[in-house]
Amino acid sequence: MASRRRVLLKVIILGDSGVGKTSLMNQFVNRKFSNQYKATIGADFLTKEVQIDDRIFTLQIWDTAGQERFQSLGVAFYRGADCCVLVNDVNVMKSFENLNNWREEFLIQASPSDPENFPFVVLGNKTDVDGGKSRVVTEKKAKSWCASKGNIPYFETSAKDGVNVDAAFECIAKNALKNEPEEEVYLPDTIDVAGARQQRSTGCEC
């Protein structure tokens, strides 16, 4: 049986503990949201096939722990990333102020070949909380920071309601694709079949 080629796009999600990284990933991949908070231990990832310009790509999304004691694991998980997503909670100023620390840590540990042009996307999450009355990070402030870092794309999201989640990940996928080398990952059919079974088990709706 003939084999086919597929491009794997690796995306890393970073941000303080509790900003909604896991919820954003689950909302995008599985269309699910849980009010029960459970801290990520180390790192985890989900995959989803996305279509860009009539081509199918596999998006591998890594959800990393926000706790400091796990940050030393960064090198192993960050290497080979095609895009980095920085997430903050619009209701917690400290999570916004820490975005620069997360960005710098990623660039140091991932060591991308062209750090000046490496693609980042920023998500201001939890816009649904208290009807928006609790927010302390304004859209203007967030966009100003993004502009100062090379015009990083910015989206305001609600993992709970699904607001802007698809649009954000479409942008993430396109930016990851721009950074992906021309060479494609070669996957034999035997591995592809196993991957398809794994995908069905996650409940992914592509």
Swiss-Prot record:
The modification Cysteine methyl ester is found at C206. CDD domains: Rab7. It comes from the Eukaryota. GTP binds at residues 15-22, 63-67, 125-128, 158-159. It is a lipid-anchor. Coiled coil: none annotated. One of its GO terms (biological process) is protein transport. It is found in: Cell membrane. GO terms for cellular component: cytosol; Golgi apparatus; nucleus; plasma membrane. A lipid is attached at C204, C206 (S-geranylgeranyl cysteine). Keywords: Cell membrane, GTP-binding, Lipoprotein, Membrane, Methylation, Nucleotide-binding, Prenylation, Protein transport, Transport. A motif (Effector region) lies at residues 37-45. Gene3D superfamilies: P-loop containing nucleotide triphosphate hydrolases (3.40.50.300). Pfam families: Ras. Intracellular vesicle trafficking and protein transport. NCBIfam families: small_GTP. Belongs to the small GTPase superfamily. Rab family. This is Ras-related protein RABG3c. It comes from Arabidopsis thaliana. The gene is RABG3C.
